[in-house]
Every structure is written in structure tokens, then in C-alpha cells.
Amino acid sequence: MEDKKTALLITYYWPPAGGAGVHRWLRLSNYFIENGWKLHVYCPENAEWPIIDNELQKQVTSDLTIIRKSIFEPHKYLGKKNNPNVSGGLTRNSKSSIIQKLIIWTRGNLFIPDARVFWIRPSFRFLKKYLNEHPEITTIISTGPPHSLHVIGQKLKKERPKIKWVADFRDPWTDIDFYQELLPGKWADKRQHNLEKKCLQEADEIVTISDNCAEGLSKIGQRKVEVITNGYNFPYFDEEKIDLDSKFTIAHFGSMSFPRNPEILWNVLSDICKENSSFKNDLLVNLIGPVDFTIFERLIIHQLERNYKYIALVTHQESIQMQRASQIMLLVANRTGNVKGILTGKFFEYLGAKRPILAIGEADSDLETAMNLTQCGKFISYDDYSTTRTEILKWYDLFQENKLECNSINLDMYSSQSLAKKYCALLDSLL
């Protein structure tokens, strides 16, 4: 049986790609070999990733077999090359123009399931031959988004019915919170739902990252969905002690799109600044990553223009160091529909930094559950001014006394090593 424990991972995000999409499988893959699984990783060679982070290539273990194939990316012809603000199509540089709306409509109606649709056919042909040359591969794992990769998996499964196929959903498909922003017409919407249902019903196993997300996928596919959350790697954080920021820093890492605007926080910070000159002098909001232009407008309206710092892009290693030095980590869930099941990789990375997390989102969500389980900070509903103010003032008092700490618990269950063991056990059950 041992010589049969080889899997093929089909992924779009792989180093030197940076950003949120790469970390789930980069981390899990590190521990597959110790659980008895060899992994072949199929990824694009010349992709138009919105973020490049060459440092991540150092985290790729030598026991992986990496296969790269060129990909046609329509984004390069739409003026989006290497612009981190188009990640997910949610953050904007300025007010939407007719051209921008046309680009979004094109994406939502012509590129189905997504802009990587042109990689499906050549990948299927290439991997069909590759599987013939590597009969030891018994299992395929497709991870999306982009969900075009699930279509590749579905085609390979149809071609080789005996092979096992696991569809790994890092985000929902048609239930993703920005789906309607893509302006899908009736034909496109029907096509998306048909593809989604087909993949969900034909895969041997469906895996996703949270309970609410699993519930949504289960309803669509009419089947059980396994939950294996994102996680983090302990070694990246178990380094020498880092000096904390001298300012009372509230740091947000990653994309802050318009639906993630933490308006209640700006209200609270603005009011306290007006009442307390010491607080105003100490406060610094660090925004690291793509930020929608409306966020800056709101900061100015709340007279916080001198209390924030914007850094467009840092490497993953730099972000880890900055997280560990921050006084407070800010995590905001999109204020849109279907957000209860979104438990992002950012949350787990914040856990590893072991600094207090201020999470703003929807009540009874998977994020609130995880916050309560780990006791890593404070979860606050979107419009809860009183609790937000109380927590900020409490943390500021502790900051002034050099006693602001995070005493989180139950972290082992979210380590990439533990999650990889769980994933490999699932793969074992398919053999």
C-alpha cells in the first residue's frame, strides 16, 4: 500500500506567488511526507499573480515534485498586471469607471468559472498524459479558488474513474460574498451553479475551511463536506523575542476592501482622540496591503489622517515580523451576505503572532467561534460601539503599563502539522 500513497495537487497559487491563497497548501505540504504521502504539485509557470514573494520559495520542501505549465492570463490584456489591488476584484484605486465595470462584467459573464478558464483544457491534456506516466498517483486534490482548477479535477476524474478526487474549497463558489459584484447574467449564473453542483457531486471527497462554509456546500451538493481549517506553522513564530512597537499600533494585514471598512472602529478611535491627547499621540493604525480608496476617505472624515500609515506591499517574512511587533491585530470580516463561514488564513497567522486580535464581524459566525475557542482577543459585532470603545480603552491602559499581552489557548489544533495529519488520514480512508 505504501507505494500507492502518492497524490497530485492542482493549485494556482504556489511560490513565488504571494498573498493569502498560497499559504494553506504551502504549509500543509510540508508535513505530507511524514504522514506517508508523496505529493506532486501542479501549478502555473508564468501566472499573473497579483503579489510576488520570492522568499516563500524557501518554504517549499525538497521532497515535493513540482510541475509547472504555462498559463494564458487575460488579465495582462485588461491592464491588471501585477496590481495587488485587483486581487479578488474587490479593492479599487478610484471611483468605478465605465471601463472598470465592463471589465468586471466580462469577468463575470465570459470567463466561467473564472479568468483561469483558459488553463482548463491544456492542463487536462497535460495531466492526462502525466498520470499515465506516473501510475503511482492514486489521488488528485484540486484547490480553489480559482474554481477552474476543480473543473480540471472533474475532467480527470471522468477520464480515470478509479482515481480518487478531493475538491478542496478555500472559499465558497457561488456563495462567495462578492459573487453578485461580478454582475453575472442569467446564462452565466446558471452555468456557474451547474459547474459548481457537478464538481460537488462528482468528487470523492469535499473539504473546506469552516463549518458554515461546509453547510453551504453540503446543501448545494447534497452530501457531507469535511472541515479542515487553515492553520499556521509554529516554527515561523518561535524565534527570538521581538520588541513591541513604541506606538499603540492597531495593524491590519492584507486586502481591506470597501466591505471590510471597520466604520465602528474609526468612530471609536476618532472620539477617543478628541477626548484624550495622549491617546491621539500614541495611536497609529498600520494598513499593510491593498486598501480601497474609500477607506482612506473615511479615515480623513474621522480626522485620523495623521494616525495611520499605509504600506502597499511587504514580503511574508516581513509581515510576520511586523505582526509580532504590533500591539493589536485588526481582523475585519466583509460586511456582505454569506460571510458567516469565512474563516480566513489571516486569522491563523494572527494566532501565530500571539498578539491580541480585535475581530469585527457577524455574530454567530465561525470567526466568533474560533475567537472564543482560542481566547486570542475580542470579537465585536459590526455596530457595537460600546464594546469596541471599552476594549480599546482597556487595551490602551495595558499598553501604557507595558502589560498588553495575548494569552491564547487551544492553538495546537490549528497547527499545520496537526491539520496535515488530519488531511492525510482522510486521504488514507479513500484507498
PLM regions: where:
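Carbohydrate-associated surface elements
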Residues: 212, 231
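Nucleotide-sugar-dependent
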Residues: 260, 315-322, 329-348, 356-369, ...
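A conserved catalytic-core segment of Leloir-type glycosyltransferases
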Residues: 44-121, 130
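Nucleotide-activated donor-binding/catalytic signature segment of Leloir-type glycosyltransferases, i.e.
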Residues: 282, 287-289, 294-320
